[in-house]
Amino acid sequence: MPIQKFPPMSKNFPSFDCDAHVVESALTWERAEDNLTREELSALKKSIWYDSTTGQMTVNGTMSAGISGLPVTAGAINPGSVAGPGMKHPIQRAINVRNLKAGTAITKEQATYLDHRGAYEPKARLKDMDIQGIDQVMIIPTDIDTYPWIQDGPGAAALCKMYNEWAWEYCQEDPERIFFAAMLPLQDPASAVRELYRVADKGCRVGLVRPIDAMGNYPLQPKYDGLWRAMQETGVVYGMHPFPAFGSLKPAGYTEQHSPSELINKTLSSSGIPHVFLTNVQNFQSEASVWLISALLSGLFERFPALNAAIFEASSTWLSFVLDECDKFYKLYRNERSMAPLKQLPSETFFERCVTGFEGDEAPPSRMPDFYEDILVWASDVYHHDGDDVWRALETMHKANLSEDRQAKFLGGNARRAYNIPAPKNFIRHRVTEIERPDWWPTQSEIDIAMKAESSVFAPPKPTIGNPSKRAAGGEK
């Protein structure tokens, strides 16, 4: 069997992954009847339901909706569950290039191997965490572009309760290592408050909010003040998680723009640019920056002085520019405000009350440690296709000569402080340097060919498929 090898690495502190994902699958839905009342289950089925027999999700009467629970099929990898241990981006690229041709496409058995069970099952996740150097993790659902569009308030509340109960049960496999961020039914603010108190009693530390204006429900409106008060009282962090604005479940005739990233998607589409992932360069940051500027300059954090927030999956390099601009424009126009004056500069509020996520290949934060000292929290984004392990983040930090004290803060300490979570009694110190792989694993020559730009468009030279070697490709030199 081929062996994928990695250079030895070590760390002397526990890590905390502030934003990793589970994939909502049949395992999530099969607990609905046990965790919901009869009335809640009825409301759920009328609004959103997953049929385990057909593998189809129905949302607001629309069949085959949503992006979670994708079936494992030959010739495709699941982008929501592929980034398990050692699944580096060049390997994913090589397999995607294989899938361009029927003759080289992966089989269903091979696709199942790449569909990492940790995205659905906690025992498998804990094993993967040991390899990936992840000591503690905050799990977040995947299908956050679907849920804000559920039309019925009771149905949305039932969905959130169903997911949150399943996520809590998932965490019980090792409650010192796995934590969950709760979904909240913003369609009905009163239900969102009740659900927040309920999950807080279960030890939940984060309430998730998608910063979009779905059905006129942008999460800064006065009708949500009760929710922010509840977050203050419970200490639950306002978890702001953006996403590309597909908007596939917008009601017929709904023409309002619901997200800044919707404009980005339309711009690329009208320009004839075919690759959907090109929008990711701007989508996440656009939703996050619009929310942050609005929250800071509207005085949200001054009206709720014990409210704390975390920005997820938006990178962090843009933040220094945005905070500088917020300070500059507040100074310029504060005498023209029709709102109450702020008690301190927007940047000062952010540094006191917020943290921002970053992923391991994002280099600028490690070069600007004074700015990010207390606000930076690492995210793996595992098991999504762009996810990676703590060792990748450490490589980036080592190149910037970042001190070990700051490595410890960025990779765990800041997140635990923000969430008020204690460090684990034990933690992973040394990297796993070898992973046994199946015979069909991509060879290095195949990866080299796949990484050429033309490989995604033109037929590449025929690589050798399934040729085992003593060392599997895709490790690190």
What are these regions (language model features)?
Residues A20-H21, D381-V382:
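Active-site metal-binding loops of divalent metal-dependent hydrolases
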Residues P2-P14, S25-Q136, E165-E173, R194-R198, ...:
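Mid-to-C-terminal alpha-helical segments outside catalytic/metal-binding sites
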Residues Q151-G153, D324-D327, K399:
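A short secondary-structure junction motif
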Residues H21, A26, T142, I212, ...:
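Flexible loop residues that form catalytic
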